[in-house]
Amino acid sequence: NDITVIDSNPDLVGQLTNSLDISGITGCASHPDVLESAGARDCDMVIATTQSDETNMIICQVSHSVFTIPRKIARIRSQSYLEINYSDLYQSEHLPIDVIISPEKEVAEAVISRLEIPCAFEIETFLGGKAQLIGISIDSTCPVINTPLRQLSQLFIDLNAIVLGIRRNTKLFVPDPDDQIFGDDQIYIFTTLEDRIRTLEIFGKVIQKGNRFIIVGGGNVGLTVAKKLEENKQNKVHCKLIELNRKKAELAADSLERTVILHGDGLDLNLLEEANISQANALLALTDDDKTNLLTCTRAKTSGCELVLSLVNDSSLNSLLKPMGIDAYINPRSTTVSSILRHVRHGRIRAVYTIGDAEAELIEAQVLGTSSLAGKTLRDIDWPEGVLVGAVMKGNEINIAKSNTVLDEGDIITVFYNSEVVNKVEKMLEVGINFF
């Protein structure tokens, strides 16, 4: 790929060009001359992710009108621009944006997904909603610790689940069949939805959904999460939202129907007790300040809250999560990056999910008839080191990959791999320089 980054900060451009194999331009990305200097006339795609919605819109408009760039992706944060009533705004004859990425919406959906499996610290759905990647922490009570993964496959022969990754002492690696799971490991399991509960039980985890939640932070993410919780008609939710800024608290009160709004500091123990923190099933720390989120979670945990979830923007803080008692976290940047990557990869790549701080990826792709993979068994394919195929979907049937599984044209496969081999994996899956 030939990638050019445009930014108004010359120091940032310098850092990127020195550390990555990319080109850089300093300037305003919405200006036609700057875009042209970046190679817009020969560009296949523009991704506008500045801090300004309006700038991102202009970038897409100029890219379309002046340079006829075929695909345009924009990050749009303001909820006003995302109202369903105004969806026609983004038609090609009006404002030509092909894909809109809303970070707040993506993060809110990730939060709701975590609440479905409280014992998981990370969840992502694949294969048309029929399978999930689930990250769980292992403790000494796990029934299958110190058991080789090969033996697990033999013990639970009909189980549609596989361990794709293990994080041990902060290092994430793709396991071999003879590797074992130890206490204090974090593991990533790929499983079908049908076998999800049984799989978690094998590793000593039980899904216990709650309906009493406390949200700290009434910004776009907190407000979106509260609205989604209110929409849950099957499980009547009791939700309280704490917001320090009075104007935001008043806006939340006007926007929400059943959520109780508390104006104050989420770190205030008296306020947490007023919110009945000891009886809450989960506290969601969703402010835009990492330290506030982490400290709020720690205070909630020591006050008896069952589950605490934090937004963490700075990945260097990840090593503090376990000592601080944080049960689950969401990195907004990683969530947004994964969303963007779904739309920029080559070949028939249908989905990409970034693991941790870009340590690894899980990719969902279609096997093309002209691909080097078609017609081969998995054991006959020369995969790079650090790659593991999770599942193969043939038609509507999903099966965990075996060494004798044959890949046919049209099959959908999920592949887990270390970030160092991204280009090699993509090369194996693509058949040309075409998006989608």
Give the predicted meaning of each segment:
Residues 1-436:
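Cytosolic regulatory regions of ion transport systems
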